[in-house]
Amino acid sequence: MTDQNMKILTVDDFSTMRRIIRNMLRQLGYTNIVEAEDGAEALSLLQREKVDFVISDWNMPNMSGLDLLKAIRADEHLKPTPFLLVTAEALKENVVEAVKAGVNNYVVKPFTAETLKGKIDAIFKE
């Protein structure tokens, strides 16, 4: 069972997508949710606040989700942070690149709250 009180950071340049993910998380019982518009803003927030889990879009301006993942894995303090990458295409090359960068799991848009729950449960069973 995952900690319903864990702090979750959702990162997406599209505010509607952040709202959709936030609503899904609330539906699943998670209420401690913070948001960022891109990887650069997310990284800044991660360096200031303790976050237990990151859900990030892949394609964003300023800093992509993949670049955010690489920055997190390169930082000794942030390195252990579980990371779920959200992508529009499940291209094999992209998945391989994300796995090499240290992603815990990924989900392809569009997805349901049930799919999100399955991904979160799988990450926290690792």
Question: Which role fits each region the language model picked out?
Answer:
Residues 15-34:
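Two-component/phosphorelay signaling modules centered on CheY-like receiver
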Residues 22, 67, 90-105:
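Alpha4 helix (beta4-alpha4-beta5 surface) of REC/receiver domains from two-component response regulators
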Residues 35-44, 65:
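Helix N-cap/capping motif at the beta->alpha junctions
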Residues 44, 66-79:
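Short amphipathic alpha-helix used as the core "switch/output" element in two-component signaling
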Residues 49-55:
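Active-site beta3 strand of CheY-like receiver
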Residues 60:
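Receiver (REC) domain active-site loop signature in two-component systems and cognate sites
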Residues 111-120:
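C-terminal output helix
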